[in-house]
Regions:
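A glycine/proline-hinged amphipathic helix-loop "lid/cap" segment
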Residues: 1-70
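Short beta-strand element of the alpha/beta-hydrolase
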Residues: 68, 79-89
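Short amphipathic alpha-helix adjacent to the substrate-entry channel of hydrolases
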Residues: 96-117
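Alpha/beta-hydrolase active-site loop
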Residues: 125-147
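Gly/Ser-rich "nucleophile elbow"/oxyanion-hole loop immediately N-terminal to the catalytic nucleophile
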Residues: 142-157, 177
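Short beta-strand immediately N-terminal to the catalytic nucleophile in serine-hydrolase-like folds
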Residues: 156-159, 188
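Gly/Ala-rich beta-loop-alpha elbow adjacent to hydrolase catalytic centers
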Residues: 159, 163, 167
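Hydrolase active-site cap/lid region
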Residues: 172-210
Length: 210
């Protein structure tokens, strides 16, 4: 159990949260992770003035469809700046369906459109599949900015954890291909070290996999 690794002085703050372990059984982990996230977001009231719409794009390979969710606050007049957002989950977990409250709050608070990407997950879809999904999405976003009421000159990328790692890779891909420019990148606790060989990765030995 993860909670047994927490300092007793801090444990009380975690009591209201759902207990969650990362097991070697990935299908079970995904089911429990999604259930945990769904329970967490059920506490939030939706923001009616930040509606969203799903779009389906063709990926660069294997005739795969990429689901993209665009949030656009109704109180923004004129073309809005946009943040392409990539969810976390260790590259193996996560979905845009469990991030609705966070995306609505971010779009409302910042005053921008949010474009959330349902990129493919490992191990079923190894690198570079998720990165290709992200590049296909931002290319679509730039090309369709006018119809989406988005300012193509103010498009940023960002993500959290594994999503931030993808955002960093996407920024490099955009730079190298030179097809368009980005305003900035927002990396929250980015997962960047592909070696994953810090002491904390292996100690204490709990049987928990990452």
């Amino acid at each position: 159990m993860i909670k047994k690794l927490i300092d007793p002085e801090l444990l009380a703050n975690l009591e209201p949260s759902i207990d969650f372990d990362i097991w070697a059984d990935l299908p079970t982990t995904r089911i429990k992770y999604t259930a945990m996230q769904q329970e967490r977001i059920s506490e939030f009231q939706p923001l009616d003035h930040v509606p969203f719409r799903d779009h389906y794009l063709s990926a660069m390979q294997n005739n795969h469809e990429i689901r993209v969710r665009v949030y656009h606050p109704t109180n923004i007049t004129g073309p809005a700046p946009a943040l392409l957002w990539l969810h976390g989950g260790g590259y193996v977990l996560g979905t845009i369906d469990t991030e609705v409250p966070m995306m609505q709050l971010m779009a409302d608070g910042v005053g921008c459109a949010i474009v959330a990407v349902e990129y493919r997950l490992a191990p079923e879809h190894p690198f570079p599949s998720p990165l290709n999904d992200c590049y296909a999405t931002i290319s679509w976003l730039v090309k369709n900015a006018e119809s989406l009421n988005i300012d193509s000159g103010r498009i940023a990328i960002g993500g959290i954890s594994a999503g931030a790692g993808l955002a960093a890779g996407l920024a490099l891909m955009v730079r190298d291909r030179g097809e368009f420019n980005l305003s900035f990148q927002l990396l929250l606790c980015p997962m960047l070290d592909d070696r994953n060989e810090l002491v904390s990765t292996h100690f204490p030995l709990t049987g928990i996999s990452w």
